[in-house]
Amino acid sequence: MAKNVRELFNLSGKTAIVTGGSRGIGKEMAEGLAEAGANLMLCARRSEWLDETINEFRGRGFKVEGILCDVAKPADVEAVVKATIEKFGAVDVLINNAGISWGAMPEDMELEKWQQVIDVNLTGCFLFAQAAGREMLKQNSGSIINIASIAGLTSSANGPFYAGYVASKAGLIGLTRELAASWGRKGIRVNAIAPGFFHSRLADRVIDLYERSVQENNVIPRIGNEGELKGVAVFLASDASSYITGQTIAVDGGMTV
């Protein structure tokens, strides 16, 4: 018998790792998973933000742990997955959300800055997918959600210009498809979310430059609101999307239509 809708979206008993889960859209998506019943392992680079979010979530009755992590360091990644298994016994969902950016014209882009962006936004996602994927393969089940960007679907035609960021997010979309193809027959689904403009630590630096354009040109003429990403995250994490893999869902108010 088919599950009803409540059952399809229910994450009770599931455990999710959320990178960059202490602030912004990462925190929002983690909140959504917890509201659907999931246990959380949050990782972030700054203890003050991580501790604040953990305390807030525990105050709401969520089952949540946290660990400091630099996603570009393999040892840190392995430590997060190990801690998750030790605490909760499984890794059912991974949200690869941690990211950085650096703006510069291509001819002025410092190689060191380029590499930092690639290391976090692309290599870090691969490292976490690899480590979590090994555990998911033992279970023959799992959902990996990579947080890409509409920057990976388009370009910075009107500036400001972010060659490293755009390349990293386009690469992440390609990695999403390849991981989906590699692991689909082994019970693991891999999808991506490509947000448009939402208020966050990264986006707030440029939102003022784009907000008028968004209001004039978007099909839905505004910046994304708080809460408009977590539903998509829960959908992709849950059995509601059990026949979906290798896809990138743009949540952008119609910007890429």
PLM ranges: what are they?
Residues 47, 68-80, 111, 227-228:
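The beta1-alpha1 cofactor-binding region of Rossmann-like NAD(H)/NADP(H)-dependent oxidoreductases
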